[in-house]
Amino acid sequence: MSKSPWIIHYDGSSCNGCDIEVLAALTPLYDAERFGVVNTGNPKHADIFVVTGTVNEQNISVVREIYEQMLEPKVVVACGACACGGGVFHDCYNVLGGVDCAIPVDAYVPGCAVRPEAIIDAVVAGIGILDEKAEAMKADPAAKREPGAEGAKGAHGSWAQVQDAAGAHGAGVACETEGEQA
């Protein structure tokens, strides 16, 4: 990648434990900037979308809007048990599930709360995925990734991808979007 990857962070409905860990990962103690990571508040400038918390009826449109405003290529990282599958809030009346109920996810970071080191590992893995997507776009400029085209886990998404680095174990949870199983 010829430029530093810019990330945008969004916290859905959660206990804010993972949200705090994402912020901790951006502090000098963990020094995410050594990988060239820059935090931005503008989706049009972001390459990597880091999401914590669940997707619910109130924030699903926000999650989708941020995703759609990002330019291709883009990577989505779901951080924490809530973002991966709904977590402890999964059975709440307004919770639809994890991030993959709304948009395709490329990397999952299970844990409650997820460790800052695991978040950094996922973002670094996301840089590799971003490079792959950029190369694919050069090879086929007409190809564009549509939400849901690769299934619930996205083109690269898997539990094992970041699970070993995270040192945590997660389990997939089926989610419901508009009454259908994803």
Positions of predicted regions on the chain:
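Iron-sulfur-associated redox domains of electron-transfer enzymes in respiratory
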Residues: M1-A182
